[in-house]
Regions:
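Acyl-CoA thioester-binding alpha/beta core of soluble enzymes
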Residues: 97, 101-103, 111-116
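Mid/C-terminal beta-alpha module of Rossmann-like enzyme folds, strongest
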Residues: 13-79, 87-89, 106-109, 116-144
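A conserved structural motif in NAD(P)-dependent oxidoreductases
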Residues: 1-7, 100
């Protein structure tokens, strides 16, 4: 995951320095899991949300597709194995810097707050589909 501000700033810097080449601009120079993003999001927002970690097989049973229904997530199996493990050292050496994750989260939350609470996002699951998937998961786990 990379903050668009960081990417844009770096690209302008490259142009000003007349640097060209192939770069993997995928995020910070450390491993960043979706779990960490979600935990940091909870902490930044003060949310008491409960994260439900479910196996990829369950998502498939619910007809939830990697990347389509769940943006920024793919199972680490088969054709997707290693999908998010991209070496970006060359990019960092060329000057890419990434702001702290919590800054990106805070700015994204501020932007999202400009929409009405009932706004239906075009990316990701609808509220109804999310509720149905969670209900199925909780039923499978014997929880209400």
């Amino acid at each position: 995951m990379i903050d668009a501000h960081d990417l844009a700033s770096w690209m302008i810097d490259l142009a000003e320095r007349r640097l060209t080449g192939v770069y993997n601009a995928t995020g910070p120079d450390y491993p960043l899991s979706i779990g960490r993003v979600l935990e940091e999001s909870k902490a930044e927002s003060g949310s008491d949300a409960v994260l439900n970690w479910v196996p990829a097989e369950f998502l498939e049973q619910q007809a939830l597709q990697a990347w389509q229904d769940l943006p920024a997530w793919v199972p680490d199996v088969g054709e997707y194995r290693g999908f998010f493990r991209v070496d970006c050292r060359r990019t960092v050496a060329a000057g890419l810097t990434c702001r702290p994750l919590r800054d990106t989260i805070r700015e994204t939350r501020e932007w999202a707050a400009t929409f009405t609470p009932d706004h239906e996002w075009r990316a990701g699951l609808s509220r109804a589909r999310e509720r149905a998937a969670l209900a199925a998961w909780h039923a499978r786990q014997g929880r209400p």
